[in-house]
Amino acid sequence: MKFGLFMEWPNPSVKFFSSRFDEGIKQIQLSEQLGYDYVLIAEHHFSNYGFSPAPLLQALKIAESTDRIKIGTAAIIVPEWQPIRAAEEMAVLDHFTKGRVFCGVGRGYQPYEMGGFGIGLEESRPRFQEGLEVMMKAWTEEEDWTYQGEFIKVEEPITVFPKPYQKPHPPLWLAGSSEGSMKLAAAKDITPLTSSMMGMDGVASQFGSYVRARKDLGKSVEGLQMSLQCMTHCAPTMEEALSQLPYIRWQIRAQKALTERRVVNGKTQAEPYEGEMAQDIFLDRTYLGDPESLITKFKRANDIGITNISLWMDWGGIEHESLMRSIKLFGEEVLPVLKDLNPPESSVTKAIASEEVEGTFTVTGDRLSADGG
């Protein structure tokens, strides 16, 4: 299994921007020293939910501040970008880092953020599909090309340079939770990124959709990659880990407020809401605990086919020192036990035989932060 921090720099107070960015760099540097494999950078705009409006610039800063760790986006919200510029900038970043980057993409799910760019959420899926097609063409076409879509038109024949450092392009991840996302990932050889908030039955169902889609397309189902984002805190005792729950609850409630456009002067109205996930289910789907309990939970994820874990540790104003202790303890006591694990061969067999699980979560904020569909 591979592990990396997920960064989106939440800032409930809407203050101290520079120090928040500096703290994030220190967290990433510590994770590299401890043997974490990568870092993922979110994209969010216009609120204290997350200050990551320029993921490729932030990725470049991280690259300058580290030596080895891989750097990925999770995700570039494709409908909010001019896709040729996105492809160009990602290619340049790929060269500057000598191939340390990978590109996570998503269609987005927040009407408030998209509205700020003059985009309706109902347009996000076709804009995403067209944008991804254009990005792929920009990276791979060696001769002049054009494109005619509903939203994106490239009428002047062009060839885009530079081509990426990695061939044919940086590895792609797709942030998403729907069966359609799994089918798209299968068709385009993209690594899916889903959320533990689906519950393990839901995640297993998604992996099944992905494996069956690849099988139906005549593609290999051996050695597949599947990524899982988990809200995580590692502490010496379960009691100490659970003391961080208010920070997670703020993040989830802020996410819900964004979904409902309850934002004033950039501050989300992060309040309790009807239909919040029951505490026992919430604790099952988040990863708060001592090292031993976290090892057990992550082994369960590996057993159903998960190969990559996105550790969402920075949420809701959690103290930097507490977060650094969590990163350190996880790196020293959890990572060494799990890093050599691979999913059992039976995970693919079970995935092929599995059926879709419906209704495993609702769109109430308890979801992946950069949904691809």
Language model regions located:
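Acidic (Asp/Glu)-rich catalytic clusters
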Residues: 32, 59-67, 90-101, 184-187, ...
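Conserved, mostly hydrophobic/aromatic
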Residues: 3, 35, 43, 62, ...
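Hydrophobic faces of well-ordered beta-strands that scaffold small-molecule active sites
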Residues: 3-7, 39-41, 71-74, 101-105, ...
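N-terminal beta1-alpha1-beta2 module of alpha/beta enzyme domains
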Residues: 1-65, 69-71, 167-170, 348-353, ...
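An alpha-helical appendage that flanks or caps ligand/catalytic pockets
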Residues: 125-161, 201-307, 339-373
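Alpha-helix-loop-beta-strand connector modules within alpha/beta enzyme cores
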Residues: 52-73, 127, 131, 327-343
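Flexible, glycine-rich active-site loops centered on histidine and acidic residues
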Residues: 2-17, 79-147, 191-192, 198-202, ...
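Glycine-rich, proline-tolerant flexible connector loops at the mouths of alpha/beta enzymes
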Residues: 38-62, 77, 197-200, 312-324
